[in-house]
Amino acid sequence: MDIRAAEISAILKDQIKNFGKEAEVSEVGQVLSVGDGIARVYGLDNIQAGEMVEFENGTRGMALNLETDNVGIVIFGADREIKEGQTVKRTRAIVDAPVGKGLLGRVVDALGNPIDGKGPIQGAERKRVDVKAPGIIPRKSVHEPMATGLKAIDALIPIGRGQRELIIGDRQTGKTAIALDTILNQKPLNVAGAPESQKLYCVYVAVGQKRSTVAQFVKVLEEQGALEYSIVVAATASDPAPMQYLAPFTGCTMGEYFRDNAMHAVIIYDDLSKQAVAYRQMSLLLRRPPGREAYPGDVFYLHSRLLERAAKLNDSQGNGSLTALPVIETQANDVSAYIPTNVISITDGQIFLETDLFFQGIRPAVNVGLSVSRVGSSAQTKAMKKVAGKIKGELAQYREMAAFAQFGSDLDASTQRLLNRGSRLTELLKQPQFSPLKMEEQVVVIWAGTNGYLDPLPLGKVRAFEDGLLSLLRGQHADILNTIRDTRDLSDETAGKLKSIVEGYAKTFA
């Protein structure tokens, strides 16, 4: 091997020329103890609350407890590689996440890193995950409908863009199914070329769920063509508690990007009970004093600061909105437990799902008596308002009468008629999964129910009547559906046309 002196001198000259005097100064601390996803670190005197830190092996963490002699850090990842005595480096950045349209169609973890194997996220900017909610002045009252495609909800418990509506019920009562149907129902709004004021982007945050469940959820979204306008944030049961705590905030930041840029989004937190459990675990390990049910004293603030970020902004702010659908799981229908009462008091209404109704075959298993939307009919179109007012009253009377009817069999004709109508309307509100209905189709079906066209039918034929009527209208009378959709009203003229069609159909159906 021959050594060329000229070559060596050229390399040396180049290195001397590019020699920089800058030295990187980073504040470091030392790990005192580590375990259960918590590290105690000495020496980070100037660290900020909520700041991201980096351990020697590249694992990240967040400073939560700032004490006199040490800092309590929650670790976003496995703590097996972290040892006592290792150095911890400040990043000088509060925890943030990527936001933007580049996230649509992707599955990410609680820090915004892609976990779907589709490569890095393109063109995303970064925003802090825990920011202040909009104040009173930038907001506007909720007035646009956020359709779920479910008759029982859109007619009786309407949700508006910018509202927070809680979905609450025991396990296996169809809470996630309602959320999934809501996402699928936005497909017609998100067609290519539609105006941004019409589109509704969806963010689904899975907290503490099985990986198989999340994979199945994503598969359904993909098959139904709904993933392209959705973002999935997953912190599964096998992820550390800090990730489960952070995921809802990360998802909310992604949703806020749409809200603040004159667009609309809906975010589903599935579910916040598991986030509260993860937060309780972290707090107890950080030796914060426990309160009721061993939750820390600020668990109410945990959920209120998250849900207050859902808002309908006014014209000067761009008219954007972020709608929140938090999910809470109860134990044996106990809605008076700590976390359920907290979230009920924060939200603008709740949808109660009951196990008994679910097993009776009433699905979605919504208890329309206990469920409420505090925004009410201001989040409905005129057409839906006209037909929904009647169905609410009739179902309320039916529930009252059904309780009395159990005691005696000799009922007068009017009571019998009321019970008959109520049972048909209850049957009408049933709906299979993955089959959301458009607003105009719901209006027509409910109009037929409240005007007595279902009364002569046996209960088992109600579904067939509804399906047949809708296929007739879609095929031969699409103009009626289009009129209701475009005017958002059910005029006397349209109602007259509808009456003759439904009467004709009822004769042939019988």
UniProtKB/Swiss-Prot annotation:
The record marks S371 as: Required for activity. It comes from the Bacteria. Its main location: membrane. It is a peripheral membrane protein. It catalyses: ATP + H2O + 4 H(+)(in) = ADP + phosphate + 5 H(+)(out). It is found in: Cell inner membrane. It is an enzyme of class 7 (translocase). Keywords: ATP synthesis, ATP-binding, Cell inner membrane, Cell membrane, CF(1), Hydrogen ion transport, Ion transport, Membrane, Nucleotide-binding, Translocase, Transport. One of its GO terms (cellular component) is plasma membrane. GO terms for molecular function: ADP binding; ATP binding; proton-transporting ATP synthase activity, rotational mechanism. Pfam families: ATP-synt_ab, ATP-synt_ab_C, ATP-synt_ab_N. Its EC number is 7.1.2.2. F-type ATPases have 2 components, CF(1) - the catalytic core - and CF(0) - the membrane proton channel. CF(1) has five subunits: alpha(3), beta(3), gamma(1), delta(1), epsilon(1). CF(0) has three main subunits: a(1), b(2) and c(9-12). The alpha and beta chains form an alternating ring which encloses part of the gamma chain. CF(1) is attached to CF(0) by a central stalk formed by the gamma and epsilon chains, while a peripheral stalk is formed by the delta and b chains. HAMAP family: ATP_synth_alpha_bact. Produces ATP from ADP in the presence of a proton gradient across the membrane. The alpha chain is a regulatory subunit. Belongs to the ATPase alpha/beta chains family. PANTHER family: ATP SYNTHASE SUBUNIT ALPHA, MITOCHONDRIAL (PTHR48082:SF2). This is ATP synthase subunit alpha. It comes from Nitrobacter winogradskyi (strain ATCC 25391 / DSM 10237 / CIP 104748 / NCIMB 11846 / Nb-255). The lineage of its organism: Bacteria, Pseudomonadati, Pseudomonadota, Alphaproteobacteria, Hyphomicrobiales. The gene is atpA.
